[in-house]
């Protein structure tokens, strides 16, 4: 039942609906997905609850990394344009864990973003978020399709940008 999923992409580093500029870079992204007990039913790895009521325990452990070269957006492929037409390299990483069984679902996502120079000279209100985040969610789907869920999301900004992002 063990299964592996591999995904990769090379895209424009500025996201959708972007025209080429002299500073444009690319974003290089890769993802590895491990399904040690087999794949989920009906793409259950992309829905939050266990709507398929998995009859056997199913687990996903995944990791992804993205390098956005010379982007001019504050969030890489999204967000506002950086001040003064500046560009930065942004590294992002993600680790996901999903477990589902008979209506019970547990998700956790750990993610982070790193930029070597997240602040802008002469602009005390704009920064690139440097730090980590953690999402945890657990839920139970009752047989009549009523669901209860508990979720917590927390951000851990690096000290350099903490005063700007709260």
Task: List PLM regions with ranges.
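Solvent-exposed loop/turn segments at secondary-structure junctions
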Residues: 12-15, 112
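Internal alpha/beta core interface subdomains
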Residues: 2-9, 16-43
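Detector for outer-membrane/organellar transmembrane beta-barrel domains
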Residues: 23, 33-36, 41-159
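Short, intrinsically disordered, charge-balanced linker/junction segments flanking boundaries
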Residues: 160-166
